[in-house]
Amino acid sequence: MKKYILLVFVVIIALAGYFLLARGQHKLAANAAVSVTDSTGAKVHIPAEPKRIVFLNASNLEIFASIGGKAVGRPTSTSYPDDIKESIKDIPEVGMIHAPNLEKIMSLKPDLVVGTNVPFHVMLRKPLEMAGVPLYLNMINSYEDVLKSIDDFGRFAGREKEAAAKRAQIEKEYAALTQDVQKGRDPKVLIIFGSPDSFNMSTKKSFGGDLAERLGAVNIADKAENVKDSSYIPLSMEFVAKENPDIVMLITMGGSKEILEKLRANMRDNAIWHDVNAVKNNRVYQLPPSLFTVNPGTHTIDAMKIMKEYMYGEAK
């Protein structure tokens, strides 16, 4: 009997040891770092299961929040879509996209900071790394970048199932929207991005240019000699006159009415514009800032529907 009791005791101790070991290994695995490559090509070591993520730009946070991810810090922005405003309203702000507050970021004790490839975020890499906090920079310049971001943020949030469902929904809508885009129609398009300092033409390396190409447009900016791998190149009236686009679409930084009026005044006053087909046929459109000034993320299909309507008069 004593031997039996002793045997049972040994088994209990062994099982307890096993479960404690398994629990410890699981905890170690959860806290272990994984190596990923961000949009700048940098190797970043991030927690396998980050729990306290701070976002520095609205586009990345929108995708993360759309699959149910919970952030501990967010940028100050007026560009959030209505469907996530409620879920993020109580998240502490860490400053505008162009002026992130490092002290505020660190006060939130993040185990991961997510930004985009702009100087104001790149310059945070060293001070964050010195504090033991990884910085992951994620650029969204195309439809494919949106899908990849959904996958990546699904892993970060531990919500792979929700991410897969969101991706499948977008891919289904994309297929339905593009299935009747026929070769041969190929409207010639010019997309102008206006800022307080300059007017630029969007190439296929920009988000708007990528969407236009997927909808069958011929983007005249891609024919420019100085395009290389640039997302935007300076607006050249001689080039526009030579290429003679059928459609002009305008994007203004922050939806600025002043910039839009400056663009339209230029079209009225510069005689070169008067012979451009898009102007002669009244096919100059302003793209909504909420979908084009800031990357629309999971609302990309809404942006494509508007472009398709302007290009073909249909958005099925």
Model-derived regions: residue spans:
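His/Asp/Glu-enriched short active-site or ligand-binding loop at hydrolase and phosphoryl-transfer sites
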Residues: 82, 209-229
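Bacterial Sec-exported substrate-binding components of ABC uptake systems
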Residues: 2-59, 160-192, 252, 306-316
